[in-house]
């Protein structure tokens, strides 16, 4: 039996964020394959960050390369509170909360991600057969 699209999409979000934690920590990122995130993003991928800035796929991939091992040893990221908002065919819109812990500070973002099933991308086989098409993040107040 194959996994439902919602389950696969949630798994992709969790696994990619776990990868980012390892990628951004000192002494971890150099051992990891950047293809994990490069193959995860659709060629037309766009991120609307919590500050309202818009970045395309090339900008995000470049930024992630620049940040490799750039966070402290205590950097952590968690994703939670998943909700499938919409699904049609091979596409799904997910909401989730991303929490980051860095240098004693906690920040949270409400994220809405459009993902779709796609085995192949221009840069190779996508992890889990799911690719990111669009991501919108909004700051949440932390207490």
Where do the protein language model's features map onto the residues?
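Generic structural marker for isolated residues within well-ordered, non-membrane alpha-helices
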Residues: 34
């Amino acid at each position: 039996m194959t996994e439902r699209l919602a389950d696969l999409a949630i798994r992709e979000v969790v696994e990619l964020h776990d990868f980012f934690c390892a990628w951004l920590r000192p002494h971890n990122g150099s051992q990891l394959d950047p293809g994990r995130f490069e193959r995860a993003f659709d060629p037309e991928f766009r991120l609307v960050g919590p500050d309202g800035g818009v970045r395309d796929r090339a900008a995000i991939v470049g930024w992630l390369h620049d940040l490799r091992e750039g966070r402290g040893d205590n950097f952590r990221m968690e994703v939670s509170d998943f909700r499938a908002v919409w699904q049609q065919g091979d596409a799904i819109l997910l909401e989730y909360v991303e929490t980051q812990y860095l240098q004693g500070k906690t920040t949270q973002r409400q994220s809405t991600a459009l993902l779709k099933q796609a085995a192949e991308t221009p840069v190779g086989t996508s992890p889990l057969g799911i690719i990111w098409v669009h991501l919108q993040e909004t700051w949440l107040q932390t207490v």
